[in-house]
Structures are given as C-alpha cells and as structure tokens.
A protein has these predicted regions:
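Short, intrinsically disordered or compositionally biased N-terminal tails of bacterial proteins
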Residues: 1-6
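Short helix/strand-capping hinge loops at secondary-structure junctions
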Residues: 22-35, 51
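Short, solvent-exposed loop/turn segments at secondary-structure boundaries
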Residues: 7, 81, 118-121
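Short secondary-structure transition hinges
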Residues: 95, 99-123
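Short hydrophobic/aromatic patch on the recognition helix
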Residues: 41-51
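Alpha-helical structural segments
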Residues: 10, 14-21, 25, 39, ...
Length: 123
C-alpha cells in the first residue's frame, strides 16, 4: 500500500480513537474539535481533510462503536446450543455493553440527536 495512503488511514484512525474516548467521557456537547486536535496531536488541516465537521467525526465514532458492539454480541452468541440461547446470550452481552459509559453515552444518549433519528435507527 502507498505510504501516503497508510499515513492517511493512520491519521483518520487516530482521530476516531481520540474522539471516541472524548465523546464517551464528555458527550458530544462536552467535546470540542479543539479538544480532539489537542489530544490527538493532529493538525486542523489533517482533521478537516478527513472529516467535514464535528458531526462527521461523531458519525465515524458511532460506526466504530456499533461495529464493536455487533462483533461482541456475535461472539457471545457463537457458542449457543440453539437460537433461543443465542438470542439470550447476544442480548445479555448488549445489556452489559449498554451499561458501560462508552455505549451508553455515544449510542444511547447522543447518537439520535447528533446523527438524526433515522440514521441512528439504521445503525
């Protein structure tokens, strides 16, 4: 892979990882793009090269959290003996995640108001 492409992916991942921590801790309203810049060590130009707005950063964070939630619940259900047990294990796994600060703040509290109800339902 081209070195510039690799650096771009790395920069984007760093922005998302930093914003994920900040949004989980302080919520969407309590997190500024300035704080994301400071904590990630990314330049303003690099941030806006990858994301058009704070909302776009949040959408990328939401997608990453949703991917992790789906993977975790799928792993929990993978060893089930039957479909009912798989549902029970997946749901229990989701409830455990939902009790955690990250999923509660990003997915359950902020997502519908930041990205809109329709997009939130599609996640």
């Amino acid at each position: 892979m081209n070195k510039n492409i690799e650096m771009g992916i790395s920069t984007r991942e760093r922005i998302v990882a930093t914003a994920r921590e900040l949004f989980a801790a302080a919520g969407y309203e309590g997190t500024s793009t300035e704080t994301v810049l400071e904590k990630s060590g990314i330049s303003r130009g690099a941030l806006y090269h990858h994301f058009a707005s704070k909302e776009a950063i949040f959408a990328a964070v939401l997608e990453a959290v949703e991917v992790d939630v789906a993977a975790t619940t799928a792993r929990a259900a993978a060893n089930a003996r039957d479909p009912v047990e798989a549902l029970r294990l997946a749901f229990a796994s989701f409830l455990d995640l939902a009790c955690g600060q990250e999923v509660r703040q990003i997915v359950l509290i902020d997502a519908h108001s930041v990205v809109g109800w329709q997009k939130w339902r599609e996640c």
